[in-house]
Amino acid sequence: MSDTAERVKKIVVEHLGVDADKVTEGASFIDDLGADSLDTVELVMAFEEEFGVEIPDDAAETILTVGDAVKFIDKASA
């Protein structure tokens, strides 16, 4: 798992209170990890703060899984 993926996983575990084993790249924030719409907004804000990237609303709507977040952050940080 990449450094970005590890950091995303840590944020998800802290914000959603889920078991780290459930936070896989294919895990859906809503369907698999039990996030609601407010949780997803808070996660996006946490990702922006942690990685120093801006995630526009239209992009945030496409970040549905842990892997989506990692890919977006890696691309935005490049």
From Swiss-Prot:
Specify the protein name.
Answer: Acyl carrier protein
Organism source for this protein?
A: Brucella canis (strain ATCC 23365 / NCTC 10854 / RM-666)
Q: Which UniProt keywords apply?
A: Cytoplasm, Fatty acid biosynthesis, Fatty acid metabolism, Lipid biosynthesis, Lipid metabolism, Phosphopantetheine, Phosphoprotein
**PTM comment, free text:** 4'-phosphopantetheine is transferred from CoA to a specific serine of apo-ACP by AcpS. This modification is essential for activity because fatty acids are bound in thioester linkage to the sulfhydryl of the prosthetic group.
The compartments listed are:
Cytoplasm
Note the coiled coil stretches, chain numbering. Answer: none
Q: Which PROSITE patterns does the UniProt entry name for this protein?
A: CARRIER, PHOSPHOPANTETHEINE
> A Gene Ontology biological process annotation?
lipid A biosynthetic process
Record keyword Phosphoprotein present: yes
Hey, which family's this protein in?
Answer: Belongs to the acyl carrier protein (ACP) family.
Q: What pathway is this protein a component of?
A: Lipid metabolism; fatty acid biosynthesis
The answer to whether keyword tRNA processing applies is no
Matching entries from SMART domains are given as: PKS_PP
Positions bearing O-(pantetheine 4'-phosphoryl)serine: 37
Q: Which Gene3D superfamilies match?
A: ACP-like
Encoding gene (name)? acpP
SUPFAM superfamilies linked to this entry = ACP-like
Gene Ontology CC annotations of this record: cytosol; membrane
> Domain Carrier: where?
2-77
- Functional note: Carrier of the growing fatty acid chain in fatty acid biosynthesis.
